[in-house]
């Protein structure tokens, strides 16, 4: 009944004011600007671009804000390689300089990146940062490092969250599940196919393992390396596994930026109210190949003929705001130029 009422009332889909819309466009411009700069400056280098699901960046900004409003002190993120560089810079807060140093040579020591021993490829690194939330103080953000074993990080993040939830309490009191919140970002193919996903979900509601709910994002670019969904899973949706555990799933169009934020508001409210998992299936596409050295038109020629012509979510939203008279196309281009200027500095 609670979930039904929330959806029917559209309380999670409030009318956004001009300031909030401008901020959303800024976040989209930053996400797209970073990817486009790296594509030009380091042509062919692997980075596993977020392009096609760029809305993840403003979604993470908002979910962290909502977690802080519910009493959260720390967010622990787990994800594979796709989009990690964007999350490291725009969510965790490492500098562009530290990120670009990873493209130039040996790992930079002394920054925010979690680097030890001989180091690792840039899209495996973790990092720690903080964010100031207006009126609420500071919230800690940690992105756990991850190997190329995609969903390997799921139980690790759950374990990190559970241990820290107990550290926030005293005298053996119950864990504070509102203080420490885990967020997992899955790939669509891996989420449906890898057993560790089901194993972690199976533990989520057990007294000895529960973390008070994980917020899940599926970066659904509708292809797994070169495999189409119909050839990679026996279910309609990449998120169908969650149905077996009674976990709510919300499918959202990655090109509808404001709807993406509405999904986040509902997910955060559900997790806070029920202390249980929630899944957002962010349905988009992958603008380049599996990595930037691949040519996807060899294996998905018709799909990539369409993707090449398709505008980015930033461009779509900029057009929407221009039509609404909130931000002109010239102002949107100025915002793009400002992001590019920061990256060139």
Model-found features: residue ranges?
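Flexible glycine-/small-residue-enriched beta->alpha junction loops
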Residues: 305-311
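Active-site-proximal loop->helix
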Residues: 240
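A mobile, often basic/glycine-rich helix-loop segment
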Residues: 299-304
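Conserved phosphate-handling catalytic cores of large alpha/beta enzymes
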Residues: 224-235, 243-289, 293, 297
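Conserved internal helical-beta-strand scaffold that buttresses enzyme catalytic cores
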Residues: 1-197, 201-214, 219-230, 234, ...
């Amino acid at each position: 009944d609670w979930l039904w009422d929330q959806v029917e009332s559209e309380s999670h889909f409030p009318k956004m004011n001009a300031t909030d819309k401008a901020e959303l466009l800024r976040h989209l411009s930053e996400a797209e600007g970073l990817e486009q700069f790296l594509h030009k400056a380091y042509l062919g280098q692997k980075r596993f671009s977020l392009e096609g699901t760029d809305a993840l960046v403003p979604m993470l900004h908002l979910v962290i804000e909502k977690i802080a409003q519910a009493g959260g002190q720390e967010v622990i993120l787990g994800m594979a390689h796709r989009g990690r560089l964007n999350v490291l810079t725009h969510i965790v807060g490492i500098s562009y300089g530290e990120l670009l140093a990873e493209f130039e040579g040996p790992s930079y020591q002394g920054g925010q990146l979690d680097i030890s021993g001989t180091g690792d490829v840039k899209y495996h690194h973790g990092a720690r940062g903080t964010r100031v939330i207006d009126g609420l103080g500071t919230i800690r953000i940690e992105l756990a490092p991850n190997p190329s074993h995609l969903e390997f990080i799921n139980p690790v993040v759950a374990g990190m969250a559970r241990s820290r939830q107990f550290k926030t309490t005293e005298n053996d009191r119950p864990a504070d599940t509102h203080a420490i919140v885990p967020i997992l970002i899955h790939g669509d193919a891996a989420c449906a196919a890898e057993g560790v996903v089901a194993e972690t979900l199976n533990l989520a509601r057990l007294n000895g393992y529960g973390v008070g709910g994980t917020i899940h994002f599926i970066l659904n670019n509708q292809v797994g390396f070169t495999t189409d969904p119909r050839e990679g899973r026996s279910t309609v949706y990449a998120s169908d596994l969650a149905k077996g555990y009674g976990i709510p799933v919300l499918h959202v169009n990655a090109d509808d930026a404001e709807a993406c934020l509405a999904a986040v508001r509902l997910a955060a409210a559900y997790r806070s109210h029920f202390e249980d998992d929630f899944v957002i299936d962010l349905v988009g596409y992958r603008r380049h190949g599996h990595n930037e050295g691949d040519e996807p038109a060899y294996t998905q020629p018709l799909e990539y003929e369409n993707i090449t012509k398709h505008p980015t979510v930033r461009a779509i939203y900029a057009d929407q705001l221009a039509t609404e008279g909130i931000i002109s196309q010239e102002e949107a281009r100025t915002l793009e130029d400002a992001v590019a200027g920061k990256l060139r500095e």
